């Protein structure tokens, strides 16, 4: 697998597009321990993810086809799909699979690594450091991710964000568990997290 030659905003190597050009259920557990890095210095280690499998997944935004809201998910892999939910929160996904697949990985939690002062300023006063990025809406707020970042190229690193491999391998022998906050597809074990990490939004029971 070839690596991107674009300079990474965090020590390591930008994860190449080929990494994302696979099924979301393959990409998701391998995203664990990668770094979500911003050009302004904010960075966190990915410790919790969920996969959404497009037309095969009734919980996916893309299950019923392409709309203006979810169009980014049908585009090329290695881009952000950022959506607004509950009338108040942003969530970010990595688009996976070939063009038109409509699949992706929701980043659910980060372990903050750098730029904590900026993260604290972006979150409500008196937020504990443990809670800065513990949950999908919290992490987008802490990292400065919103609607303007929908479609950002995470591989080119020219749009302010990248996924970086700093050499830490994903956890071995991971078991998936049920996804959170969905009404359908709860039986699919497509949520993964770093075992024992205190920044995970909740335990991942096995199905």
From Swiss-Prot:
Transmembrane segments: none
Keyword rRNA-binding in annotation: no
Database matches in PANTHER family: DNA-3-METHYLADENINE GLYCOSYLASE
Family to which the UniProt record says this protein belongs: Belongs to the DNA glycosylase MPG family.
EC numbers: 3.2.2.-
Alphabetical UniProt keywords: DNA damage, DNA repair, Hydrolase
Organism in which the protein naturally occurs: Burkholderia cenocepacia (strain HI2424)
A GO biological-process term: base-excision repair
Pfam families: Pur_DNA_glyco
Annotated protein name in UniProt: Putative 3-methyladenine DNA glycosylase
GO MF term set: alkylbase DNA N-glycosylase activity; DNA binding
UniProt KW DNA repair keyword: yes
């Amino acid at each position: 697998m070839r690596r991107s030659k674009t300079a990474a905003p965090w020590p390591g190597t930008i994860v190449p597009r080929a990494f994302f050009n696979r099924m979301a259920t393959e990409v998701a557990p391998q995203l664990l321990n990668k770094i979500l890095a911003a050009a302004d210095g904010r960075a966190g280690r990915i410790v919790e993810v969920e996969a959404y499998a497009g037309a095969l997944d009734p919980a996916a935004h893309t299950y019923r086809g392409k709309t203006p809201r979810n169009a980014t998910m049908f585009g090329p892999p290695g881009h952000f799909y950022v959506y607004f939910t509950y009338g108040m929160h942003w969530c970010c996904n990595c688009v996976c699979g070939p063009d038109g697949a409509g699949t992706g990985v929701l980043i659910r939690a980060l372990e903050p690594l750098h730029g904590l002062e900026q993260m604290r300023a972006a979150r409500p006063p008196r937020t504990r450091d443990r809670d800065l990025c513990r949950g999908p809406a919290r992490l987008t707020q802490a990292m400065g991710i919103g609607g303007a970042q929908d479609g950002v190229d995470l591989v080119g690193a020219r749009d302010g964000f990248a996924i970086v491999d700093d050499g830490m391998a994903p956890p071995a022998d991971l078991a998936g568990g049920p996804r959170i906050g969905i009404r359908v597809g709860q039986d699919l074990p497509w949520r993964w997290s770093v075992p024992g990490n205190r920044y995970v939004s909740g335990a991942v029971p096995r199905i």
